[in-house]
Amino acid sequence: MIELKKEIYEKLVSEAEKISDEEIRNVTLNILKEPKITFTKAEPKISLHESPAAPKKHHAYPGGLVEHTWAVLTIAKNLAEIFERTYHVKVNRDLIIAASILHDIFKFYQYEKDPITGGFRPRSDWYLSHQFSIIAELSFRGAPEILIRCLAEMHGSVPTSMIESEIVKFADSVDAKFVSRIQDIIRDSCKDIELLTDGKYIVQKTYPQILMKKTIFELARIYYEKGRDKLTEFIIRELGIKLEE
């Protein structure tokens, strides 16, 4: 699955290369190709490609961060087109692409692998949230003020004054809420397994384990086509769980 996320990453690079403004394009590509915090001494414990978008809330699986970034970019571009056609407003596509790509890019610095559950957890030694890290890094690299402002606004740090900030913020929210709902469906089946095994297989372990083997939407498809019980049975088989007679 990590290989699939690397394919998505290459698509992000391709989109960044389409940015017409040279300064915005260069800083976006430089950070995307080498996502490293340089304004302070800091080292990540996991890579961008393997990172979840969040340990629990949404896209909480390996590669979830890259997948979420691609979804936000795709949604934001389509929203921009809809708003331009419907309301005849001018949307800066360079900002849409750059802000979508960069909005969560340093999240992987915040997380580490969880040796107990097999999933991910927040680092206890990390002191910078991603929304502040990207603003500081862009400022340190001398990025255009309009890009810094767009990202600050879409993260809610300051009042919104740009339509591009609103579009990316909305795209981010839509994708996060949608995938969070799908995750709840899968967690419910994992909770069923915990009850069926009298707590032997707890949800905190079965949930990350099944997402190491199957994509979230492979599992969701089973639920929508066959129902919750069939999804629970599928997870039991995939994880080799033995139910007592």
Question: Which positions does each model-derived feature cover?
Answer:
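Acidic/His-rich, divalent-metal-binding segments that scaffold phosphate/diphosphate chemistry
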Residues: 1-120
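Divalent metal-dependent catalytic cores for phosphoryl transfer on phosphate-bearing substrates
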Residues: 53-58, 67-68, 84-197
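Terminal helices and disordered tails flanking the catalytic cores of nucleotide-processing hydrolases
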Residues: 200-245
